[in-house]
A protein has these predicted regions:
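Short hydrophobic/aromatic beta-strand or adjacent loop that forms the aromatic wall/cage
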Residues: 16-21, 153-158, 182-188
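Active-site metal-binding loops of divalent metal-dependent hydrolases
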Residues: 36, 70-71, 185
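Short proline/glycine-enriched turn/loop segments at secondary-structure junctions
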Residues: 146-150, 176-181
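Acidic carboxylate-rich catalytic motifs and surrounding loops in phosphoryl-/glycosyl-chemistry enzymes
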Residues: 8-11, 131-141, 171-176
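Metal-dependent phosphoesterases centered on the DNase I-like endonuclease/exonuclease/phosphatase
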Residues: 51-156, 161-162
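Active-site beta-strand termini and strand-to-loop segments that position acidic
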Residues: 1-2, 22-27, 161-163, 182, ...
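Low-complexity, intrinsically disordered Gly/Pro/Thr-rich segments
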Residues: 166-177, 186
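Structured beta-strand-rich core segments of catalytic domains in phosphoester-bond hydrolases
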Residues: 1-41
Length: 194
């Protein structure tokens, strides 16, 4: 019905195969899906992935975009909308400060790590995108796509869409994760582009 033409991968990205992009023929819209490497095992590569992804999308401002994937970020979202990245640390009193895993401190500062994650997770608006789940559910919904061993929900999987969108529904389907098909719950997003 609407064939998709592949878009050349970002060769400067550490793992270019972790970003797949296509242009929908007969429509002025691109679809991008990514799997950002986890920082715990890849360190600065995660930061570089975010930086290259943002740069790639920022250079494509003339076309509407949908961006999906496993971003392995953020660490935490508060009900106020505040985002805590993996470049930050939260003290027992709740105070937030810039920090980075000591394992990676020689490769990447906490400031750079924080900025790289925010470039997409928080500053997606600069790319003409909205966070479909948050637009539909606000910040009081603390659903997640991945859970720690202590049961803490983390919202690592996202769908960002163009601003001219009518969102019908968006939720994390916990059943596939509970049935052990994946360690992540898929994000369901149904919407119309106006």
């Amino acid at each position: 019905k609407n064939p998709i033409t592949p878009i050349e991968p970002v060769s400067s990205m550490p793992f270019p195969e972790r970003l797949l992009s296509g242009h929908i023929k007969n429509k002025n819209i691109e679809i991008h899906t990514t799997h950002v490497p986890p920082g715990s095992s890849n360190g600065v590569i995660k930061v570089q992935h975010f930086e290259k992804l943002y740069e790639f999308l920022a250079n494509r401002k003339d076309v509407q975009k949908i961006l999906t994937g496993d971003f392995n970020s953020p660490k935490l979202e508060r009900e106020t909308g505040e985002i805590i990245t993996w470049g930050q640390k939260v003290s027992s009193s709740g105070k937030v400060r810039i920090a980075v895993n000591p394992k990676w401190k020689n490769e990447c500062s906490g400031e750079r790590w924080d900025s790289a994650e925010r470039s997409i997770i928080q500053n997606h608006k600069d790319l003409g995108l909205v966070d479909i789940f948050r637009e539909k559910n606000g910040y009081v919904d603390n659903s997640g796509s991945w859970f720690t061993n202590k049961g803490i929900a983390r919202r690592y999987d996202h769908v960002f869409g163009p601003k001219n969108i009518s969102i019908l529904e968006s939720y994390y389907d916990q059943k596939p994760r509970e049935q052990k098909y994946s360690d992540h719950s898929p994000l369901v997003a149904e919407f119309n582009i106006l």
